[in-house]
């Protein structure tokens, strides 16, 4: 049978044309949502109630994406971004929205996701909020050596790219660390080994400022001397991390960063937590303290109670819970962090606290050390705790505090708890990352009587 050529619609023209859109809300990733020819259109950078000019960049069956070209009618929440690297650096993505607007959006998005995907409606509590700028106590900067210019660039990666955007300061990084970026860029370019340097990690700890330089080969004596001189001049602890993951202090002594909790709680003795660069630690010190305090308030640990802390890390929640008198069992999947947690417990003189390494997706309910659990705290990674909840149903703890860095997995896991007879009592936003779309939350569940 003969087949005749039929011209397809010129989709490239449709994609390249600039069009006007009315934005009515934000998605949970912070992109503006509009409607166009029966499709949802996602427009990063656009805000609710705005009329914008945008260019379609992607067409799918049920949705499309567009690039913001111009804001024709701005929202009352639109502000001028303060960072000169905004939109080139891949870090912040909501600086164009007021801080109050960001928090209102995040709180509403959290409630909406929980209601839509878990059918859960709890009593919303005030969001945990802090400083909007200079809040990060830790950051990892990427390096890129240009073989042509023989220069090393230091900065953050562009959004969805391996490209390094050179920066000389960062408005969300703790001020002392931000002030070190430009001097470090100059220093690293003076080293003979600059072509073999990896990332630079900066840490603002309670016992000083730290820098970790990833190296792929040993540095010569002159380079080591320059690093030691820089460290002394800037009053910073510098260590090198080699290919084996080992750390070496440039002055021959390795000092690890420390932060304290409960130091602002009346009548409580502070706990100190030491951590190794590279291991997970909450980057917002102010919000972390508030988050731990809220978890303690909700769980109200009492002497004689047994509390299970899953995904316990190096003891961020475990140590304060034990300090207030409960018997705490911490379980973590990363062996190095279990070792660090045990060292932290010993350093703080806590004998009512034990840590175990375990596969949290496996059934741990029959482990000889598990026993009866009165209360449970969960602080999983973005993937959530779905597998863990399958065996935790046997434990039937009276209360569950779930700390989440992903509202989607929180909603999915909440549905499991609700099916097991729990009721959502409290739900609140944790604004751990101002100027970004990231939503963290804490939820309290209680077993129905």
Swiss-Prot record:
GO terms for biological process: rRNA base methylation. The keyword 4Fe-4S applies. The active site is at residue 405. The keyword S-adenosyl-L-methionine applies. It comes from the Bacteria. Signal peptide: none annotated. Keywords: 4Fe-4S, Iron, Iron-sulfur, Metal-binding, Methyltransferase, rRNA processing, S-adenosyl-L-methionine, Transferase. It catalyses: uridine(1939) in 23S rRNA + S-adenosyl-L-methionine = 5-methyluridine(1939) in 23S rRNA + S-adenosyl-L-homocysteine + H(+). S-adenosyl-L-methionine binds at residues 282, 311, 316, 332, 359, 379. It is an enzyme of class 2 (transferase). [4Fe-4S] cluster binds at residues 83, 89, 92, 170. Catalyzes the formation of 5-methyl-uridine at position 1939 (m5U1939) in 23S rRNA. Belongs to the class I-like SAM-binding methyltransferase superfamily. RNA M5U methyltransferase family. RlmD subfamily. This is 23S rRNA (uracil(1939)-C(5))-methyltransferase RlmD. The lineage of its organism: Bacteria, Pseudomonadati, Pseudomonadota, Gammaproteobacteria, Alteromonadales. The gene is rlmD.
């Amino acid at each position: 049978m003969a087949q005749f050529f039929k011209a397809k619609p010129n989709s490239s023209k449709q994609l390249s044309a600039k069009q006007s859109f009315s934005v009515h809300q934000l998605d949970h990733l912070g992109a503006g949502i509009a409607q166009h020819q029966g499709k949802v259109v996602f427009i990063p950078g656009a805000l609710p109630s705005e009329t914008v000019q945008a260019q379609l960049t992607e067409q799918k069956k049920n949705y499309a994406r567009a690039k913001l070209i111009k804001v024709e009618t701005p929202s009352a929440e639109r502000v001028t971004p303060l960072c000169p690297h905004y939109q080139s650096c891949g870090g912040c993505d909501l600086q164009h929205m007021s801080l109050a607007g960001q928090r209102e959006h995040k709180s509403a998005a959290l409630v909406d996701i929980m209601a839509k995907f878990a059918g859960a409606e709890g009593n919303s509590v005030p969001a945990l909020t802090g400083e909007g700028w200079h809040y990060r106590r830790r950051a990892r900067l990427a390096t890129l050596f240009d073989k042509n210019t023989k220069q090393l660039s230091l900065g953050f990666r562009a959004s969805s790219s391996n490209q390094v955007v050179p920066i000389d300061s960062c408005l969300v990084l703790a001020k002392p660390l931000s002030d070190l970026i430009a001097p470090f860029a100059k220093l690293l370019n003076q080293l003979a080994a600059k072509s073999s340097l990896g990332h630079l990690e900066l840490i603002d700890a309670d016992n000083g400022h730290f820098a970790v330089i990833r190296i792929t080969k040993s540095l010569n004596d002159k380079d080591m001397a320059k690093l030691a001189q820089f460290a002394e001049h800037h009053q910073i602890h510098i260590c090198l991390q080699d290919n084996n993951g080992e750390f070496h202090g440039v002055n021959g002594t390795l000092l690890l960063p420390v932060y304290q909790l409960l130091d602002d709680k009346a009548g409580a003795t502070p706990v100190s937590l030491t951590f190794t660069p590279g291991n997970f630690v909450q980057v917002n010190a102010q919000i972390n303290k508030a988050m731990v305090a809220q978890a303690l308030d909700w769980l109200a640990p009492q002497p004689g109670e047994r509390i299970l802390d899953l995904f316990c890390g190096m003891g961020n929640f475990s140590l304060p819970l034990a300090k207030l008198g409960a018997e705490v069992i911490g379980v973590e999947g990363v062996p190095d962090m279990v070792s660090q947690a045990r060292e932290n417990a010993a350093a703080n003189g806590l004998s009512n606290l034990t840590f175990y390494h375990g596969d949290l997706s496996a059934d741990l309910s029959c482990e000889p050390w598990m026993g009866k659990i009165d209360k449970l705290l969960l602080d999983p990674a973005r993937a959530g705790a779905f597998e863990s909840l399958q065996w935790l149903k046997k434990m039937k703890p009276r209360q569950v505090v779930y700390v989440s860095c992903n509202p989607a997995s929180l909603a999915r896991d909440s549905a499991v708890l609700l099916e097991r007879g729990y009721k959502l009592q409290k739900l609140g936003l944790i604004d751990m990352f101002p100027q970004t779309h990231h939503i963290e939350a804490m939820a309290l569940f209680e077993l129905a009587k």
